[in-house]
């Protein structure tokens, strides 16, 4: 074992992985039921009380916000500043004697400012009788905030339209009608020009009559008038009903406004296109995808005295296969393994550094350099460690680099002799390692937003995929040339985010079967926090975003495993290998167009549970990551170490269904 410095264990750990006191003390604070206006500030004051309402000593009370961009909180002073309206959570943590932590979440409401105006828009300017009118409503507040989830009071100037209790507006008779929306005393109106429905009949066709669950049908509908002339701008809508072949199941699927349909469950489906009261239907069959294969555990490399973090498998300069794995919340140890025989994973060397957590490990493409991250260093310098792994049986530390990385490094990536290292969960720095003994910082990337945060960065083809929690994924040119960026001048050129704000990792891939370019965005959610000694509850899923049009990314599909949350993953050859924390390692078919809920569609090929009775936390699966390497699926498990598994060969497809 190599040791870079003596280890002094501190009770330092990131908030998302804290261990909390289980006694009956509680935090009482003046931010209970706090209500603020936008731009208003308030200073929190909190004490800790026991069951008898006596104040209990608290060495330090710290605060943080679940949404720092909208509600900024000074961790030390407790000053809270409201930047955006809505409901938010402020977490108060009392650090007690012996390092015990007591926590309480407080809800803070930030009022919306006065309404400035209401905007009403037509989604489609062609309005026919006997049709619902597609409208969008926005409330625009002072200070520029926009909201579209309020209940308006809608009225009409005449009886040419009807308005139901859910504010759906239907065209009844041809002519002009004025629709008025009112909210908080502010009104806005729009004139609706309604025409008599000219559609006589609709011709509905599809690219296939039968396909598997998960395969996408394309329906095309053409509207004609009484003279058999095409009505090109007819507002055609699509819908479906279905009946499962399995009487104990319920048919389900998804249909888009452009006529694409996917069935989740095998059954018979009726697809309908309509313009007002004129419709056409077509019956299709959806059969089982039938892609299950045996997925077997091959070998394990047990770590039973501490938690395991990330890992990386690589080919050494000697042509043999090796792996490196980090450890979490322990003593800063990194392990090296010989995995040439996947059924016999052999621990061959280790390095111990001044850290509690070595969260991430990466190896250069030539198999010569390993970079590991540090968090919880006793001297608070943290940073990265650069290691010579030309002989994995006898690895040697080359250098450490801490400049601008003292707040802790959670993830790293090596690309073309540059290390991209996260700094304190806020930004990443680019460090040149042409001379690994003398690493040099040459660039950095940050969003430049209040409360900016980042969890991961992944690089392919000169593009860095920066995973920024609430701000989603940023595509950053670090040498690709698409935005004239470079390692010393990273330039963001595309972005996508989603409502949960839990975006933790990104994996880009181009579909081999369709040519479409996707980024797969993963959540990381622990609804009840982390239990370092027992079973955990995890949540979240993978979001599939079609980035073929960089200016208009579209979220098209998800992989969500009921009851288990996502973590790290790998894609190769239209197959996904994903560690679903408590749900184990899952293998998922990504062939063809992707649309809807991939799990419901039966796209899962197989899975293993990675827990072990000899683990640090016995019989408790907590799969951390997966990597396909030379035909085997390697993985790490937070509780048990590393392992390998293998899929049986693909069986010939005997189904007759196909999408033409």
Where are these regions (language model features)?
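Feature marking well-ordered beta-strand scaffolds used for ligand recognition
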Residues: 205-207, 264-660
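Residue-level detector of intrinsically disordered/flexible regions characterized by low predicted structural confidence
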Residues: 4-7, 119, 308, 538
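Bacterial Sec-dependent N-terminal signal peptides
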Residues: 1-24
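Conserved short hydrophobic patches within well-ordered secondary structure
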Residues: 4-6, 80, 169, 311, ...
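Selective for proline/serine-rich intrinsically disordered segments
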Residues: 4, 83, 111-112, 132, ...
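Extracytoplasmic soluble-region selector
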Residues: 22-291
